[in-house]
Amino acid sequence: MFDIGWTELLVIAVVLIVVVGPKDLPPMLRAFGKMTQRARKVAGDFRAQFDEALREAELDDVRQTISDAQKLNPVNSLREAMNPLRQMGNEIKADLQKATTVTENKTEVPPDAVAAPTPSMSLPETPPLVATPAPSEPVAAAVVQADTVAAKPKAVRKPRGKIADKVDAAAAVAVPVEKPKRTTAVRKPATLKKPAQTKKDEA
């Protein structure tokens, strides 16, 4: 404990015998032992109290972490987050119910106030007049105008070099092609197809 060797203890014992004397040395050693025992007991009590305080602090920390974990329950946080949404949904439902009840009250009309005429179930004696179709002259005029527009030749870009002369001569010779008039196609009569022969039919 004090890093005292045997030789040093022997020197201390010799000094105590010389100073205190052989007669008073045993009661003094007993008092010193009791004092050491008391000091150890106080140190043990202090250590026990200190250890108990540490355990309580650790338990408090554990209790605190458990309570934090319970407070951090995701279900509770989701409930708190959904609560405003639930309130908004209830408000919207209430508004919709008010709107539907108001419109139902406004649309209710007493049956005596509105009398719908009953339609007759018989056919009229004279057929209704149908407007005669307009003459087809404007359509023909539109076709003639379309032919004159189509008859205009497109401007041809002049190529460079010797080929340009050949292309110019060919373009001058080309005659603008008139668009053929639209005619209705004649339908061919439907012919019956012969069923295809299979190998089983041949056999």
Swiss-Prot record:
Topology term for the membrane: Single-pass membrane protein
Identify the GO cellular component terms for this protein: TAT protein transport complex
Query: Which compartment or compartments is the protein found in?
Result: Cell inner membrane
The cysteines covalently paired via disulfide bonds are none
Which terms in the Gene Ontology molecular function aspect does this entry carry? protein transmembrane transporter activity
User: What are the record keywords, sorted?
Assistant: Cell inner membrane, Cell membrane, Membrane, Protein transport, Translocation, Transmembrane, Transmembrane helix, Transport
Q: Where is this region: Disordered?
A: 179-203
For this chain's UniProt record, which GO biological process terms are given? protein transport by the Tat complex
- Bilayer-spanning residue ranges: 1-21
Q: What quaternary arrangement does the UniProt entry report?
A: The Tat system comprises two distinct complexes: a TatABC complex, containing multiple copies of TatA, TatB and TatC subunits, and a separate TatA complex, containing only TatA subunits. Substrates initially bind to the TatABC complex, which probably triggers association of the separate TatA complex to form the active translocon.
UniProt lists the family membership as follows: Belongs to the TatB family.
Q: Enumerate the NCBIfam families for this protein.
A: tatB (TIGR01410)
* Function of the molecule: Part of the twin-arginine translocation (Tat) system that transports large folded proteins containing a characteristic twin-arginine motif in their signal peptide across membranes. Together with TatC, TatB is part of a receptor directly interacting with Tat signal peptides. TatB may form an oligomeric binding site that transiently accommodates folded Tat precursor proteins before their translocation.
The protein here is known as: Sec-independent protein translocase protein TatB
